[in-house]
Amino acid sequence: MYLMTCTRPDLAYPLSLLARYVAPGRHRKVHWDAAKKVLRYLCSTSGMGLVLGGRARVVLTGHADASWVDDLATQRSSQGYTFSIGSGSVSWRSIRSSSVLGSNCEAEIYAGAMAAQELRWLTYLLTDLGEAPRSPPVLYVENKAMQALCQEHRLEHRTKHIALRYFLARELQQRGQLRLAYVASQANTADVFTKALQPCDHQRFCTVLGLVPTVPHLLTS
């Protein structure tokens, strides 16, 4: 858990998934096998570390994503986000929704609200450190319907059931504190927080997050 929270964002989704089966009577052999697979992955990548750096000017950028109804047992959705400053990730999260969501757009809105809340806190923190963003931080999402709802400032009959408190991203955009932008799924870094990926895609996103070999001799194939 410490690694997932502090230095290994690539562990966020698998540990979030396994945490759902920690309660007595819920875990089965398949979950134990999955936990051992995570440990094997961690041993083979123990030389990986999160490296921060990049531009001289602080630029805060975020990605948010949701995987709709990926938990077949509860019909709930996985949601995640990541924020980076320069070339490294400074904040991330992977979580299952607290309720059943009616559409992929709704799941993306909930993920966007969660990310917007973290973005607001990071903006306050940077301001206190004397590094207030010079322009609205960009939050990338891959659902165009969610982006349109936040830009058009209106609700339709298909979305008016969504609690208004989840339109935090829209409110911040109206205030000029956030800019929503579209990103294709293949380029959305938050994908690694919502679903299992092919090894090549997983490695590519790890590099984007800032996870690079820091102790090369500890890496195994």
Residue ranges and their predicted role:
Residues P14, K37, H63-L72, F83, ...:
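Acidic, metal-ion-coordinating active-site neighborhood of RNase H-like domains
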Residues R40-A66, E131-P133:
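Structured nucleic-acid-interacting core domains from mobile-element enzymes and related host factors
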Residues G54, A64-A66, I85-S87, V141-N143, ...:
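Residues immediately flanking
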Residues M1-M48, A184, V192-T194:
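C-terminal reverse transcriptase regions that engage the nucleic-acid substrate
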Residues Y21, V59, I95-S221:
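RNase H-like nuclease module associated with reverse transcription
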Residues G62-C105:
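RNase H-like nuclease fold core
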Residues M1-Y13, S67-D71, Q75-S78, N104-Y124:
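Conserved pre-motif C helix in the palm subdomain of viral-like polymerases
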Residues S44-M48, V69, S89-W92, W121-D128:
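Conserved helix-loop functional segments at active or binding sites
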